[in-house]
Amino acid sequence: YSDDEIEVVLAHELAHHVYGDIWKGLLFETGLIAGGFLLASFVLGAAVGLFGIRDAGDIAALPALLLGAGAVSLVAVPAAHAMSRAHERRADRFALTLTGNGPAFVSAMRRLAAQNMAEDEPSPLVQWLFHSHPPIRERIEAAQEFQRGTGSGTAMADRHDRDDTSVTKKGR
């Protein structure tokens, strides 16, 4: 990776710190886990007496628990991934605004995609179910729009220029 590519990737990661994405993700996923345990408790409570299940600790309750966990996962995992993709898009805009180096961003995305054997454009269903990051093609197109001045990074740059505690743009 070139120095410019490293700078863009580092700026992207810095955005996660600036916006508190790790803490937000931890809180969100903790809430999902707590909600999952609560739902599991209800499922096990409802399963007692059915199918010969004597109490929540009965091994016969395990299939009911697994079905409940699967149902929770069908909602919780895509929700967590959607939040993560939003954080990634925002971090991309931050990196582009901070560095102003769209070509290095595009180059870094292409190299990372090749290194990780990422699919350029997964189906919407696959993305919704399994991807915590936006598709590479979408990220590259957003960077190219940003470079043409049609991207959505300007408001972010203005907000950071007014914030005394933020990182300033390169070259200022």
Question: What do the predicted segments below correspond to?
Answer:
Residues 54-68:
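Hydrophobic alpha-helical transmembrane segments
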Residues 66-78:
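Hydrophobic alpha-helical transmembrane segments of polytopic membrane proteins
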Residues 1-56, 75-172:
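Polar-ligand-bearing catalytic/cofactor-coordination segments
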